[in-house]
Amino acid sequence: MSYKVTYANEATKYEAPGHFDVLTTRLHNPADVNGGTIVNGLSHFLPGGGANIAPANFEMIYYIISGEMTVTLVDENEQEQKYVLHAGDSVHFGKGTKRGCLNTGIVTAQMLTVMIKPQA
């Protein structure tokens, strides 16, 4: 058994490709625990900030902590479906799913991301 506690002031800032007007922070990495497969991040999107539509590299979960995020998912027929998410709402999608998001609210939105990496 292994574990790692991360305090808010220990979150690591990083640049997420295709993201704009956002502060992205990393809370946990797979190497934090024995046999780990989860990457956990917290993103702070300014109004109008978001991420361009792109295929997901991993299975992922978005959980909205505060604010409003419009998540766009592209189906197998290349049709876009938009979902307006608020605090407490979440979306779970598989690897390869084309997705994007945009803060369509008037305040900074906080979104917790969970990325599940396949085991090697």
Question: Language-model features: where?
Answer:
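Conserved short histidine dyad/triad with adjacent acidic residue
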Residues: R26, V39-A56, K95
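Short, conserved beta-strand element in jelly-roll/cupin
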Residues: H44-L46, A56-V71
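Short acidic-glycine-tyrosine-enriched beta hairpin
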Residues: E76-G94
